[in-house]
Amino acid sequence: MQPLGIIAIAALVVAIILAIVVWTIVFIEYRRIKKQRRIDCLLDRITERAEDSGNESEGDREKLSKLVEMGHHAPWDIDDL
């Protein structure tokens, strides 16, 4: 094989590896953004229901805690007393 052919094959392999790495990073970021949108939507819904009725929806709070994976720890104050 000629040196130019070897270089072309090596460049093709490197390009394929780079494409796999880039698309993997894009997919991971897409999942992170999608999860953040669901969290933001639930936060908005909980806030809206709290303003309307004076209390949060327990189901929404459970969904949020599953998404955040922190149990009932949330970035806002929760008065369960």
From Swiss-Prot:
Extracellular side: 1-7
Domain of life: Viruses
Post-translational modification: Phosphorylated by host CK2. This phosphorylation is necessary for interaction with human BTRC and degradation of CD4.
UniProt note on regulation of activity: Ion channel activity is inhibited by hexamethylene amiloride in vitro.
Molecular function terms, GO-annotated: CD4 receptor binding; monoatomic cation channel activity
Residues modified to Phosphoserine: S53, S57
Pfam families hit by this protein: Vpu
Sequence ranges on the Cytoplasmic membrane side: 29-81
Membrane topology (UniProt): Single-pass type I membrane protein
Transmembrane segments: 8-28
Gene3D superfamilies from the UniProt entry: HIV-1 VPU cytoplasmic domain
Keywords: AIDS, Apoptosis, Host membrane, Host-virus interaction, Inhibition of host innate immune response by virus, Inhibition of host tetherin by virus, Ion channel, Ion transport, Membrane, Phosphoprotein, Transmembrane, Transmembrane helix, Transport, Viral immunoevasion
Subcellular localization(s) per the UniProt record: Host membrane
GO cellular component: host cell membrane; membrane
One GO BP: receptor catabolic process
Note: HIV-1 lineages are divided in three main groups, M (for Major), O (for Outlier), and N (for New, or Non-M, Non-O). The vast majority of strains found worldwide belong to the group M. Group O seems to be endemic to and largely confined to Cameroon and neighboring countries in West Central Africa, where these viruses represent a small minority of HIV-1 strains. The group N is represented by a limited number of isolates from Cameroonian persons. The group M is further subdivided in 9 clades or subtypes (A to D, F to H, J and K).
Written domain comment of the UniProt record: The N-terminus and transmembrane domains are required for self-oligomerization and proper virion budding, whereas the cytoplasmic domain is required for CD4 degradation. The cytoplasmic domain is composed of 2 amphipathic alpha helix that form a U-shape.
Subunit structure: Homopentamer. Interacts with host CD4 and BRTC; these interactions induce proteasomal degradation of CD4. Interacts with host BST2; this interaction leads to the degradation of host BST2. Interacts with host FBXW11. Interacts with host AP1M1; this interaction plays a role in the mistrafficking and subsequent degradation of host BST2. Interacts with host RANBP2; this interaction allows Vpu to down-regulate host BLM sumoylation.
Similarity annotation: Belongs to the HIV-1 VPU protein family.
Function: Enhances virion budding by targeting host CD4 and Tetherin/BST2 to proteasome degradation. Degradation of CD4 prevents any unwanted premature interactions between viral Env and its host receptor CD4 in the endoplasmic reticulum. Degradation of antiretroviral protein Tetherin/BST2 is important for virion budding, as BST2 tethers new viral particles to the host cell membrane. Mechanistically, Vpu bridges either CD4 or BST2 to BTRC, a substrate recognition subunit of the Skp1/Cullin/F-box protein E3 ubiquitin ligase, induces their ubiquitination and subsequent proteasomal degradation.
Protein name: Protein Vpu
Protein's organism: Human immunodeficiency virus type 1 group M subtype D (isolate ELI)
Origin organism lineage: Viruses, Riboviria, Pararnavirae, Artverviricota, Revtraviricetes
Gene: vpu
